[in-house]
């Protein structure tokens, strides 16, 4: 679909569904552009979203800032014009700001640790270079698997009983070492230090099989691996072709019978000689997702095998074992029966989180409470602490993609979805729904431009212009991405989190990390006058509730990686609180329009077509 306005002419996707939808069968999934630099392969061997394909294309064939004139016509871009698409192409598009040329850019220097990354008095060019590490210090592809893994650190120090939540971030290449000291790379998770691996199951959306195999220790690379995916037709054939060289890999296709659904769950089941571990996380199984993004991980304890003749069911107070078994059963897939049996043979009683899953289908009656936002609602009604009388505890949602939510907030966001997030134990009269603030965190154009990856980071933030134009009302809820607490302000989030903080943001009533973005496809939407919940996708997350830890509320940890005298029950929120509302010139990142007014941290522009 070609569009032309004062911004120039470009091609945009015709899809208005912002979930990470795989390309249609007749579209190629690989790029054949010549390699522009180290760290990026010449072509994508795995199937991915259109936004990610564009990001890959721009990484290997970048449009430099001084090349922009050859890409777009010489026309001044209006910063506040309601005509055309009505979108500013940069979040720093002040007409009074002098044009930036390559000659004006000072020599690049290492970024300094700052509380506020950018200052309004600094020119665009200076802001870009201040945050861009020298090319010589950027990890190269040949080494980065080692550099970003935690090899050499004492992993057991990280997994000690002093961390009751077992909630981690992935390691990020290009930030200070102290911010990676208690973070995990996939190689750490698969390390022999965690157990002697017998077999594993990898549930995910996007797979680079060759890369994945290299993340396993050499001694485990020939052990059985089950890949659970949602690919169809040519995408499925591509995945099978990737897996064909590996005799130990088998595949299981998740059924997706409702249009626009995806298999978005990200989970590892790891069977060891010593027991079983469950890992629920937010990263695709591709290099880019474990390199310079903010991602979340929950690690289960090592679950021991139940002794024969023992009368224990191995169930936890959170019913995690039953819920995980129910989730796997919902696939109705024979290859998963073996894993259901394995789970039944292990003792999961030490689990202190609740499982929140989504599975495709239409659910009525009591079945409606099993999945999606109604599952969250049911758990909060049963276990969430009631807020003190007279206090209005806000809701925070943070995500990397946004679906079509309707023409106004009443259609889904501030009706059924907010009702679920507001649920508490039935004690006292809660504040009116409209009085509860809703803070939504989604990266701005400026967040993406000044990120470690630069504009290509936006390939993992697939909010389209078609969807955005239909729901401008939503953007008044948006807050910037800022994560000084974890050193990840410049590592764009692919993590998804939802929580209920106190009015001063010092306490939490609950915290959820999940694969579910802000969409009806992920969370479900009511049909048939509210009697039926329809869900399109598979999703999975874990809910932290204070009652499961013997607490009334969680205290918010002041610094994510601090090991100071803060109480062990302080919860490590991975981004800054309170979140900062978009300013008048901030715009949400939209992947399929160009950004040519200012270069990113690599000196490049974003021209998606």
Swiss-Prot record:
Basic and acidic residues composition-biased segments: 105-118
Keywords assigned: Cytoplasm, DNA damage, DNA repair, Exonuclease, Hydrolase, Nuclease, Nucleus, Phosphoprotein, Repeat
Residues annotated as binding substrate: 266, 496
Enzyme class label: hydrolase
GO BP terms: DNA repair; single strand break repair
GO CC field: nucleus
Position of the signal peptide: none
Similarity annotation: Belongs to the tyrosyl-DNA phosphodiesterase family.
This protein's name: Tyrosyl-DNA phosphodiesterase 1
Native organism: Mus musculus
Lineage: Eukaryota, Metazoa, Chordata, Craniata, Vertebrata
């Amino acid at each position: 679909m070609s569009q032309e306005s004062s911004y120039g002419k470009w091609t945009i996707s015709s899809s208005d569904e912002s979930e990470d939808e795989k390309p249609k069968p007749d579209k190629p999934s690989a790029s054949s552009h010549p390699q522009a630099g180290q760290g990026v392969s010449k072509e994508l061997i795995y199937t991915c979203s259109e936004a990610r394909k564009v990001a890959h294309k721009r990484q290997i064939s970048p449009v430099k800032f001084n090349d922009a004139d050859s890409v777009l016509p010489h026309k001044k871009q209006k910063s506040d014009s309601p005509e055309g698409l009505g979108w500013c192409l940069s979040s720093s598009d002040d007409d009074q700001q002098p044009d930036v040329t390559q000659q004006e850019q000072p020599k690049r220097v290492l970024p300094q640790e700052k509380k506020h990354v950018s200052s309004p008095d600094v020119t665009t060019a200076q802001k870009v270079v201040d945050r861009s590490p020298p090319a010589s210090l950027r990890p190269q592809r040949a080494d980065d698997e080692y550099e970003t893994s935690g090899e050499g650190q004492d992993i057991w120090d990280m997994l000690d009983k002093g961390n009751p939540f077992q909630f981690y971030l992935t390691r990020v290449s290009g930030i200070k070492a102290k911010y990676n000291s208690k973070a995990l790379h996939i190689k750490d998770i698969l390390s022999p230090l965690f157990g002697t691996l017998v077999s594993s199951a990898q549930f995910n959306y996007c797979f680079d099989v060759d890369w994945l195999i290299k993340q396993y220790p050499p001694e485990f690379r020939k052990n059985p691996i089950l890949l659970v995916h949602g690919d169809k037709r040519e995408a499925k054939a591509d995945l099978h072709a990737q897996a064909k060289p590996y005799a130990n890999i088998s595949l299981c296709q998740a059924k997706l019978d409702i249009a626009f659904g995806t298999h978005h769950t990200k989970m590892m089941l790891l069977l060891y000689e010593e027991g079983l571990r469950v890992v629920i996380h937010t990263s695709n199984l591709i290099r880019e997702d474990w390199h310079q993004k903010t991602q979340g991980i929950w690690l289960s304890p090592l679950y021991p095998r139940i002794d024969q003749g023992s009368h224990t069911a191995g169930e936890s107070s959170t019913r995690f074992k039953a819920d995980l078994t129910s989730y796997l059963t919902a696939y109705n897939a024979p290859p998963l029966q073996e894993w259901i049996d394995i789970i039944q043979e292990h003792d999961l009683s030490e689990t202190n989180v609740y499982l929140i899953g989504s599975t495709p289908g239409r659910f009525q009656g009591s079945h409606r409470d099993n999945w999606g936002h109604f599952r969250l609602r049911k758990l909060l009604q049963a276990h969430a602490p009631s807020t003190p009388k007279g206090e209005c505890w806000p809701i925070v949602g943070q995500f990397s993609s946004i679906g079509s939510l309707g023409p106004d907030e009443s259609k889904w966001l501030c009706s059924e979805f907010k009702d679920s997030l507001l649920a508490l134990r039935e004690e006292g009269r809660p504040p009116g729904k409209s009085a509860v603030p809703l803070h939504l965190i989604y990266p701005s154009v400026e967040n993406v431009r000044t990120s470690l990856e630069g504009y290509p980071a936006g390939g993992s933030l697939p909010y389209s212009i078609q969807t955005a134009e239909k729901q401008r009302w939503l953007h008044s809820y948006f807050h910037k991405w800022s994560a000084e607490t974890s050193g990840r302000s410049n590592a764009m989030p692919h993590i998804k989190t939802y929580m209920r903080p106190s009015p001063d943001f010092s306490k939490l009533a609950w915290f959820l990390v999940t694969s579910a973005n802000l969409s009806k496809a992920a969370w479900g939407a009511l049909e048939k006058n509210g009697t039926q919940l329809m869900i399109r996708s598979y999703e999975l997350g874990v809910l932290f509730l204070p009652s499961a830890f013997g607490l009334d509320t969680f205290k918010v940890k002041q610094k994510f990686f601090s090991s100071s005298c803060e109480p062990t029950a302080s919860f490590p929120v991975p981004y800054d609180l309170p979140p900062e509302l978009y300013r008048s010139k901030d715009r949400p990142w939209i992947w399929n329009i160009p950004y040519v007014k200012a270069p990113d941290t690599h000196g490049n522009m974003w021209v998606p077509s």
